[in-house]
Amino acid sequence: MDYQLHEGKQISQEFPTDISTTKSSDLKSRKTDSPSIQRTHEFVNFSVFPIVNTNEIMNVDIKHFSPDLKCPTSPNIFLQPLTTTPNTTPNTSTTIDSNTEINPIEIQLQSPLLFQPEHLSPQTLKTTIPTFSIPTYPTPLNTKFQSSPPPPPPPPAATTTTTITTTTTTSAGNSTTKNNNNNNNNNNNNNGKSPKQFQDVLIPVTSSGKDGALYTVLENVPIKRTHRRRSANIDKDSLKCYQCNTSNTPEWRKGPEGPATLCNACGLAYAKKQKLTKNNIKFNQSTNVNNNTNNTITQLNQQINNQGLPNLTSTTTTSNNTAAAVNITTPSKRNNKYNTHRSKVFGEVAPSIVYTNGTLNNVGTPVSDTKKSHTFHEYMTPSNSFFTGKPIKTTKTKPKPKSKSKPGKITHTKHEQPQLNEQVQAIMEKNNLLSSSGGSGGAGSSSSSCGTSLNSSLGSSSGTITNSGGGSSGGGGGNLFSNQQLGFTCINNNVSNNNSNNNINNNDKQIQQQIQQVQQQVHQQVQQQLQQQQQVQQQQQQINQEPFLNQQNHYYQNIFQNVSTGNQNCAINTNGGFPQFESPMDIFPYNNNTTNCTQDSNGFVPNLANFEMQGNVLYNSSGSPSSLGQYVIQNNSFSGPNDQNPYVPSVSLNSNKTTNIKNNNNNKKNSKNKNNKNNKNNNNNTKINNHHINNNKNNVNTNQTIIKENNSQKQHQQQQQQQQQQQEQQKQQQEQQKQQEEQQQNLSINNSNQTNENEILGTTTTTTTSTATIITSQVPMNLSPNSDDNQSSSNYSTLSDSGSSPTDSFSGLSVNTPHPNCDSFSSSINNGSNCGSDIETIESPLQMSTDVLTINNCSSNRTTATNNNINNNNNNNNNNNNNNNKCSIKDDTFNLLTNSNLDSFGIIDCINGSSTNTNSFFMETPLLINDEDLLSSSNLTSSSELLPHSFV
């Protein structure tokens, strides 16, 4: 036989010098830089073998092989390094004689990953690393001998990831391309999976090419890493849940991907799911066991059904009965026997006792004698049912505890017995006591007790007794049986007790009705009070929202009105003073044409001199409010009975409350009387009613006290809110005043550029402040002396009192706008002489706006206004001033500021030379005062003109 040995191509492999410190990712980058050692390997490829007998193969001597093929002598050594020899004849072939015998047992495959003991491991090699060849042995082309199986997989290499490929192809081009493709495939496989979960292991893979040649390649096969417990030093901030992708959790739990891969919620859900699956597995195993046992039972039942025997099982509370087998051959006969058995059982009892489900309870047994009972349904099926081969389900009844009943009291016991009429009917039928008419019984007793009527109503034992009973009184008709036979107690009801109970029930109903009425009344009172509070709040809101200082002809209710001092009938002027109030007031204008106070003194305005207001009530000096008459205060305003006065409407105070209180008292009295009459019949009921009434009174009192406390709290809160609102308004007004003053200064500066010879501008020298605050939104304009009068500004800087009446001095009076008709303001009180000034005392700063200042009886040579600001008025005003010998200033304001130590401020009167004509200013804008003692009467003079006032 001829064997032809084809020698494979020499393949070289480069290795870096230091592989212990080299990573798999750096092999490509360091391939060209690091020094390498060229290793040449020779492989033998055997192909096209004839059929060889076994005896011939065993006789082959190994020496006839090529010297390049090295066969190790030791069976334990599978890998030997080759010497570095150049290959000069890569494609040589040798011919083997036909007499050559080959022993395949002696030809062993060399493993690439097993080393001899004397050699070093690849991790310790520094400079030279031997390469290893994997020669193949000849494979005959018969069915008996095939290629040897691949060696077992070696242990995983931790650091070495170099791919070693061995090919046995004959062409150089095919070997290089296949190596490159394999490397690319390995890289793609590794890159496609997460490096954390997989690691590469070198595994030899043998395959055959298209030409039938075999080649072996060591491939990097990714193997899934084993789960390792995470260390305690792991950065938990970088963790994220694999399920919900959250990073904020109190605890990390184990998931299918490993520990610390699920958040707390997802981990608990996963653990629960795993537990359910385990339980389901156990349940399925148990169900399989039960199915096996059930199959055996069903087989037995099928055998019984085939024989026509019923499988009836029953369970009771005391014992368990086994299945009873009846000798019935066919189902029809079985049913017949069943019906006969049923008829026998039911013949012993009354038909009415048998229920639809075929059960029978204890009949005629008292509660104390009730014990565990057997029911027929435990061993008997209904007639309309068919035997199915399954046992009938029964319910176990537990014995109920015996109820302890006291003598003389009714105990409502619950027991599982038929109704009374059914028991009676059953006993009657059992004892042949028919309901048809029979012989008349004995005379029944007339007493109402049901226990003693039996002996007198039954008569002879042989006769039948009708249900209608004997006796003229009918005592035996409803009471045929004693309590010993029926098993229940007889109740004796007294008529008196029934009547008393009925009376108690009726009285209770009346008491409940009275309670409901009182509660309704209290509820109505509370609602009325709440409505009144809401109305007051609405009125206050309206007052706060109204810009009353900016509106023309806006008037409030006047308390007292003012005319000239020539008429002494004015009530306030006769006493020479203003009343003292504790709440803010307005000063409003009064018609200048009115010259007397007769109309006011007749009832429109009360005599309020020397009166003080304390808690919404006016008191005089003696402490009695009698002089006020029928005038009352509502919402900080006066009201009286006279409807003709538009400023004083007639409104009564608390009229609704008084009527409600009276009605409530009357209702209470009536309810008490009715209760007393009803309670005379029954003392117990009277006590109960009184108890309820007292409780109701206490409830009403507590409700009233609660309402009062709530009202007081609400009033206190409202006062606080009002104070806060006032403070806020004051702050806003002060800011507005500052802004207005700045605007005025800017206007005065702008007007100074356009002054003519007739226009003279002054300077402001306001330096004083006041303890009271001005609640106005108007723009003040200060008056200054006219330059035509040749008066110095010093005459207007201060005003002091030098008159007969003692008054406090003023400081800081400044005037910006010229005074056209008066020569000057004097610093002393002249009591109406030579156009001087009268200072009358009122305790607050004064602001006046349009149509504020009216000067009467000025000199004729001063009637024509020379200032351009004054000329802005209509000419009609000047003509009227000339005709009436009066002059007025409009569209301008002046401001009087008091010193902090003053108790009053002055109203300046510009008077002509004569003291007989005393005239005053009339203000058309409210003056708001915020002091406890608003007005003082000690500093008033006879020449003063009083101003109209009213509450806010």
Curated annotation (Swiss-Prot):
Residues 468-478 have a biased composition (Gly residues). Keywords: Metal-binding, Zinc, Zinc-finger. GO terms for molecular function: sequence-specific DNA binding; zinc ion binding. CDD domains: ZnF_GATA. Residues 10-24, 634-653, 746-762 have a biased composition (Polar residues). It comes from the Eukaryota. A zinc finger (GATA-type) spans 241-266. Transmembrane segments: none annotated. GO terms for biological process: regulation of DNA-templated transcription. This is GATA zinc finger domain-containing protein 5. It comes from Dictyostelium discoideum (Social amoeba). The gene is gtaE.
